Amino acid sequence: LKRNENINPSQIEDLILGCAFPEGPQGMLMAKGVAILAGVPETCAGAVVNRFCGSSMDAVHQISTKIESGDIQFGIAAGVEDMFSVPMGGFNPDFHPELAEQEYYIGMGETAEILAKEGNITREQQEEFSVKSHNKALRAWEENNFANEVIPVDMYGESLVEKDEGPREPDLEKIRSLDPAFLESGTITAATASPISIGAAAVLITSRDFAEQNKLKIRATIKGRAVTGVDWRRMGMGPLPATE
């Protein structure tokens, strides 16, 4: 909204927020709370969707589907995750014994180890990829490629978060010295695993007519959506059959 000041917030009809663990500080219908804090009028509805890693993408799916069906013309799809405040699995996980027997509650790191074994992906290959990834991210920040995407966040006057803290200058010697993070004989370490992060993002989605009438820059067009399931032990492969 800050980048599109010509938009009247009263035009926003719905806000759908993706969140993998909507409890604790992320609970109590966080989508509506986000809308209120953003100054969006009370006429805007709010809903939280949980599809774990695909939660925010599902928010995009739902808003775009509402627009395509003619239910609304303008909505916000957003996502948030505070992995510092809400632990993996939530505060009081209660595992179903039959699901536990089927390894339904397997962690993401362990699923990645399964895929690495399937694909014969070595630790060295993962570390090489990680180094390249960090270098690309650092270069992108240096070249201000995220200048129009990242908005500084004021932490209650104590500090100002202006950039992603994840990318760092790779230290290959330190990377090679790390112990496996998930399996004793595994290949994935803290240097090649997903970080524990806090982050949020949001996009404005409108009908083409609405965008043209309000002189909004169209950055992308949603042509279709697809979801599909995979063996939960191979969850990292989910996007592949969905894309196909």
PLM feature segments, named:
Residues 27-28, 85-91, 233-235:
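Short acidic, glycine/serine/threonine-rich loops at helix termini
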